[in-house]
Amino acid sequence: MENQEKASIAGHMFDVVVIGGGISGLSAAKLLTEYGVSVLVLEARDRVGGRTYTIRNEHVDYVDVGGAYVGPTQNRILRLSKELGIETYKVNVSERLVQYVKGKTYPFRGAFPPVWNPIAYLDYNNLWRTIDNMGKEIPADAPWEAQHADEWDKMTMKELIDKICWTKTARRFAYLFVNINVTSEPHEVSALWFLWYVKQCGGTTRIFSVTNGGQERKFVGGSGQVSERIMDLLGDQVKLNHPVTHVDQSSNNIIIETLNHEHYECKYVINAIPPTLTAKIHFRPELPAERNQLIQRLPMGAIIKCMMYYKEAFWKKKDYCGCMIIEDEDAPISITLDDTKPDGSLPAIMGFILARKADRLAKLHKEIRKKKICELYAKVLGSQEALHPVHYEEKNWCEEQYSGGCYTAYFPPGIMTQYGRVIRQPVGRIFFAGTETATKWSGYMEGAVEAGERAAREVLNGLGKVTEKDIWVQEPESKDVPAVEITHTFWERNLPSVSGLLKIIGFSTSVTALGFVLYKYKLLPRS
């Protein structure tokens, strides 16, 4: 009662309070405002954007040190950014990509490095085909209801990879595939969750590709503009440096308290922060047991994003585009992309330090990390020019207390089937957004927009402004960034796995041997 009086006296009464000023929370606030709903966004940091963050200085002009990439089928973020007047440009892959393995550099073109060993090729082909086929069995909006959910959720992705792959070559690349896509280790994540994650991003080729894939484009001026421009539209409806500490929905209206002891009153709350950060908030009444258990069990991925700037794009002299896939345990960086500005200025290579390596290298001084990265690039690209950068930027997301890591939260084994179904379930008048709650491109900016707008429509339904059937809305395809259907050749669809080939050989050998015996003992007619 005392809190209610404080909130009312201060005049802080709103229809909805959104906790979290990232893309998801701000997408929700924008949609609610368009329906005439009074909204307040409370953001803990001194900036908006959440896990997107555009740094601006004289050395880089602008650089995305957080989420940056968009591509075909990510239609919501493309629609929103266009509405906000933000243009995209294509990440450069005009020249050759590079695979670095066992100390050697192998240039290639396409989404995946080529495999010349026929046995390894069968293994690779079967790996991607199996991951995609298993994903087809998993409902994007309810992975816990998949036919084999219990079996796959008890298994780590490492166990599944080891079960599928016969060759070290395929197994090693599969481990890297997990590192790159979810910034965690294969032994840490549930096979069910990872299979779902890849499926809801369009499959193995779509999630990993630059061209026609999740990394095709970036925003001119940086992805931070998405949140910044929504904040400009909302004006004083966004409050920075306001970490929420208490949410009390025990009375008619909900009372929100922030770290600086300000109080706000509202009818509904949208919680748009990573699930694990919800544990920083005191709820009254307490959260339901399943929700409380869930938020304690979803760790964040680990990543340090590194941008190395050079006087010129020296890699292009060798017909390299700047994309490197690096399979080397001692290498700090696992994958890179060209991060040069679309007009060709400020040549740069963006590299990810991922998962176990992020933890290991975070213990080193920044200058030592920089030196190790330059030495790696010099070795992989075969150029001493890599040793002489003009500037270096990095962002260790593991040290961000209001993110906890990046790109996204992951599900360890057993959690999806036991607690996953509550990820989007409202708690009283509290609704949940954030990219982790999305059903398409979860973990990306696209997922953040889907989740924010869905949570906003849930509130609008509660306010009587939209019907229940209008909560989930199909998004039309972007006309500016159309998707090309990903197809597979007859051989990709039908070539046997290594184990299948061995069975065929074994069967053929057995038939041949049987025929020889029958022939020898005159049990077969002679022509």
From Swiss-Prot:
**InterPro entries per UniProt:** Amino_oxidase, FAD/NAD-bd_sf, Flavin_amine_oxidase, Flavin_MAO
GO biological process entries = catecholamine metabolic process
* Hydrolase recorded as keyword: no
Annotated region Interaction with membrane phospholipid headgroups: where?
520-522
- What broad class of enzyme is this? oxidoreductase
* Source domain of life: Eukaryota
Stretches of the chain found on the membrane's Cytoplasmic side: 1-497
**Keyword terms, alphabetized:** Acetylation, Catecholamine metabolism, FAD, Flavoprotein, Membrane, Mitochondrion, Mitochondrion outer membrane, Neurotransmitter degradation, Oxidoreductase, Phosphoprotein, Transmembrane, Transmembrane helix
Q: Which GO terms describe its molecular function?
A: flavin adenine dinucleotide binding; monoamine oxidase activity; primary methylamine oxidase activity
Residues the record marks as site: Important for catalytic activity: C374
Q: Which residues carry this modification: S-8alpha-FAD cysteine?
A: C406
Membrane-crossing ranges are 498-518
- Phosphoserine occurs at S383
Topology relative to the membrane: Single-pass type IV membrane protein
Write down the chemical reaction(s) this protein catalyses.
a secondary aliphatic amine + O2 + H2O = a primary amine + an aldehyde + H2O2; a primary methyl amine + O2 + H2O = an aldehyde + H2O2 + NH4(+); (R)-adrenaline + O2 + H2O = (R)-3,4-dihydroxymandelaldehyde + methylamine + H2O2; dopamine + O2 + H2O = 3,4-dihydroxyphenylacetaldehyde + H2O2 + NH4(+)
Membrane topology (Mitochondrial intermembrane): 519-527
Where is the site Important for substrate specificity?
I335
In the record, which positions carry N-acetylmethionine?
Answer: M1
Mind naming one GO cellular-component term on file for this protein?
Answer: mitochondrial outer membrane
Q: Which cofactor does it need?
A: FAD
* Protein localization: Mitochondrion outer membrane
Assembly with partners or alone: Monomer, homo- or heterodimer (containing two subunits of similar size). Each subunit contains a covalently bound flavin. Enzymatically active as monomer.
Question: Which PANTHER family does UniProt cross-reference here?
Answer: AMINE OXIDASE, AMINE OXIDASE [FLAVIN-CONTAINING] A
Q: What function does this protein fulfil?
A: Catalyzes the oxidative deamination of primary and some secondary amine such as neurotransmitters, with concomitant reduction of oxygen to hydrogen peroxide and has important functions in the metabolism of neuroactive and vasoactive amines in the central nervous system and peripheral tissues. Preferentially oxidizes serotonin. Also catalyzes the oxidative deamination of kynuramine to 3-(2-aminophenyl)-3-oxopropanal that can spontaneously condense to 4-hydroxyquinoline.
> What is the protein name stated in its UniProt record?
Amine oxidase [flavin-containing] A
Instruction: Give the organism the record lists.
Output: Pongo abelii
